[in-house]
């Protein structure tokens, strides 16, 4: 009997369906970051994944386009970080392989500085801006290995036209990481 390639199924946790007000305008970085932090916190409280949340917003309207939470352990897939899911779902939502559409810029808001993989995916995603909360040191304090991310990594993204704002509501975002640690969350890439 030969091997078969199994279908790839990716789904968000049930609780996410009602977790975002899709028609609401989130006018500030702080308002957008609260969405990402709330997703991360709920993911921890519900026991559905790691302490990371992300959302993509239409820059012109301030409305959310997509959202993702860390789903690595829940779906047995090492690439299912919050940012990756938000990017994939955002591209699916707008019906294009890139979020860079004429007249429609998008911002990726992540509860933590992206790891090396997510930073790379961001480059190709088409977002024109990244906003982050907790920083690499906060994630590393829990023993998460964020991979080879250097100051030059951010400089490169900026040279490619991606604006970066870091440390928005850092304390609130870092508190979700601490909640995950206190609850005995699995550090899957240590």
Where are these regions (language model features)?
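Zinc-dependent deaminase
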Residues: 1-43, 104, 121-190
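Short loop/turn motifs at secondary-structure junctions and domain boundaries
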Residues: 45-49
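Conserved redox-active cysteine motifs that mediate thiol-disulfide chemistry
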Residues: 112, 116-119, 124
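A short, polar/charged loop-to-alpha-helix boundary motif
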Residues: 71-85
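Immediate flanking context of iron-sulfur cluster ligation sites
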Residues: 100-113
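A structural microfeature
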Residues: 65-66
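Short beta-strand scaffold segments in enzyme catalytic cores
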Residues: 52-58
């Amino acid at each position: 009997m030969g091997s078969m390639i199994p279908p790839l199924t990716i789904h968000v946790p049930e609780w996410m369906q009602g977790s975002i007000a899709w028609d609401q305008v989130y006018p500030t970085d702080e308002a957008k970051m609260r969405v990402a932090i709330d997703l991360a916190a709920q993911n921890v409280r519900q026991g559905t994944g790691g302490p990371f949340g992300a959302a993509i917003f239409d820059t012109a309207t301030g409305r959310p386009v997509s959202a993702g939470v860390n789903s690595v352990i829940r779906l047995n897939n090492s690439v299912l970080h919050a940012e990756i899911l938000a990017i994939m779902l955002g591209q699916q939502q707008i019906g294009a392989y890139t979020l860079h559409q004429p007249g429609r810029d998008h911002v990726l808001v992540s509860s933590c500085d992206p790891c090396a993989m997510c930073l790379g995916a961001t480059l190709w995603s088409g977002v024109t801006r990244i906003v982050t909360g907790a920083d690499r040191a906060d994630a590393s304090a829990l023993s998460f290995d964020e991979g080879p991310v250097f100051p030059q990594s951010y400089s490169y993204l900026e040279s490619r036209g991606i604006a970066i704002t870091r440390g928005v509501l850092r304390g609130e975002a870092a508190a979700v990481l601490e909640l995950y640690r206190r609850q005995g969350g699995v550090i899957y890439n240590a």
